[in-house]
């Protein structure tokens, strides 16, 4: 169990902080042992659960499941940050390039 301050509402930054705490040398042994391969099933399961929430058009369930997907994405990115291979900003940069490229092409066409 981690010691993290209780709040009425947690933020994105809190999630990032908690994931870093869990993966720290003195963090959670289970979380520290995870790899992309060992976490693959959890990642896919959360994505499928989010898709089911979409099918049900249930906003509360969507919120919960999208939070789980977000946690999985950040967890896997954090593993890569630890390995020095890429950062959250690298992923964000590529995401924005993928979004903006079709828009830019449409505007100049």
Positions of PLM-derived features:
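Flexible "arm" and connector segments at domain edges
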Residues: 1-65, 71-96, 100
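Single conserved hydrophobic/aromatic residue that forms the stacking wall/gate
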Residues: 97-109
């Amino acid at each position: 169990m981690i010691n993290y301050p209780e709040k009425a509402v947690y933020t994105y930054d809190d999630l990032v902080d908690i994931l870093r705490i869990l993966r720290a040398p003195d963090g959670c042994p289970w979380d520290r042992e995870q790899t992309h391969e060992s976490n693959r099933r959890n990642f896919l399961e959360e994505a499928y659960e989010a898709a089911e929430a979409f099918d049900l058009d249930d906003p509360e369930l969507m919120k919960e499941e999208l939070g789980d997907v977000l946690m999985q994405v950040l967890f896997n990115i954090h593993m890569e940050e630890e390995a020095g291979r890429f950062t959250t900003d690298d992923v964000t940069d590529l995401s924005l390039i993928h979004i903006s490229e079709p828009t830019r092409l449409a505007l100049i066409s």
